UniProtKB/Swiss-Prot annotation:
GO molecular function, one term: structural constituent of cuticle
Membrane-spanning ranges: none
Name listed for the protein in its UniProt record: Cuticle protein CP1246
Tissue occurrence: Calcified shell.
UniProt superkingdom: Eukaryota
UniProt entry keywords in alphabetical sequence: Cuticle, Repeat
Chain positions of Sequence repeats: 1-17, 26-43, 67-84, 93-110
InterPro entries in UniProt: Cuticle_1
Keyword Repeat: yes
Amino acid sequence: NYGESGIVYPDGRLVQFTRAEADNIAEIGEAGVVMHDGTHVQFDRDMAAHHAGTPPQPMPERVTLDQSYGYSGIIMPDGNNRQFTAAESDNLVLVGPSGAVTADGKNVQFTDDGLPT
């Protein structure tokens, strides 16, 4: 939590401000601090959540799959790779062991080899 006299970090560390540092604080908001000297302190995700009193949300992770079709392309049965464009990759919402769901509403079913039908 960022206060007028110091900081309590999400990991429990405490920092006490000097009188000059405390006097330099103009405004403390949800996302950071504005100082009288014109500098800004931008909170990172964890500090902003800690300052707001809410627990941080877990970061989403892309799942790595042991198959020939993934978020970045396809490995063909003949060993050739087909790299997706950025637009094609961005269109993939979810890739699982049996198929993929695209942002434009298509469902792609995979064969036993993990290739689209």
